[in-house]
Amino acid sequence: LYELINQFLDELQYMEQRFDTVKHEQEEDSFYSIVLPYAEHIDALIADLKTYQNVITQKVNYFNESKFSLLISNLQDLSVECHFARTSRKLFNEKLKAVRYDLNQIKRNGECND
């Protein structure tokens, strides 16, 4: 789980960089050649994360089922939104911050070091 969380944190960094590039250039990525494969990559990581759902919701303080679902939803949203210039910077950054906080909370408090 620890490695998976680190992988998600790396992906968040990529999403943030991709979003900044797309916003700066005002040129959106191709949906079928870039966005869809990347979203599928993130979905595969999410499927791995879901196998740890019970461990996370039981071991991490204040991390219940609804917070876990919101984390998943935000990860899915960010994986697509980072490729589009029309995405609101404020909303994107709020989701990014929330996801980064949640992942770090799992990493710190989860006692899940494989």
Feature locations, PLM:
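Short, solvent-exposed, charged loop/turn and helix-capping segments
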Residues: 45-64
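Amphipathic alpha-helical binding modules
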Residues: 73-114
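A loop-to-helix transmembrane entry motif
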Residues: 30-40
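Short, well-ordered alpha-helical segments
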Residues: 63-74
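Residue-level recognition of alpha-helical structural elements
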Residues: 1, 27, 31, 60, ...
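Short terminal alpha-helical segments
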Residues: 1-32, 96, 103
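Short, flexible helix-adjacent loops and helix caps
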Residues: 20-27, 54-58, 80-87, 111
